[in-house]
Amino acid sequence: MRIVDLYGQGRPIFSFEFFPPKTDAGENKLMETMADLKSAVEPDFVSVTYGAGGSTRDRTHGVVTRIQDELGITGMAHQTCVAASRADVLENVKRLVGSGVENVLALRGDPPETDGDWRPPSDGFSHANELLEFLTAEFDLSLGAACYPEVHPEAISAEDDLAWTRAKVESGAGFLRELLQ
């Protein structure tokens, strides 16, 4: 099911968010836990994070597809762009789509800590709205983006933050997920 279609049904949407475990044993334990949660609370979907530079990045695909295939729960994969080229993003999302994933949360992600200002790869994306434009042009997906009710920590002002949120919607986000700092 496309997550964007859940909204507007006049009922609360309930979901879980997990990071992919670093080991196969951890992944199997997560699947057992998710099976228990499914029978107890019937989540509408499960969101799986994507570590831009971390060791769990490559496991997002496996976890989200297992949640969908083995448990029958709608999955949403996070896709960050902070350290990714357009080719990297294209390859990863093609793989997700090929496995039946149709929901993606498009995020810039946290830049690595450096002594100077962070700069994206030369063939990458500076902001999530650029990632959303790219994904919208390449795929037919249910795309979400982050919003910050308490204002993004890098925003100049609340108005500036709202302008960035609007840019995400205008670039293809069909729904927003709130992030609190």
Predicted regions and their residues:
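Alpha/beta enzyme core
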Residues: 3, 9-13, 22-46, 70, ...
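N-terminal active-site wall of soluble small-molecule enzyme domains
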Residues: 58-70, 88
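Flexible loop residues that form catalytic
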Residues: 51, 109, 181
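Short catalytic-loop micro-motif centered on adjacent basic/acidic residues
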Residues: 47-48, 75-79, 175-180
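Glycine-rich, N-terminal phosphate-binding loop and its surrounding beta-alpha-beta segment
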Residues: 67-82
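GNAT-family acyltransferases
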Residues: 17
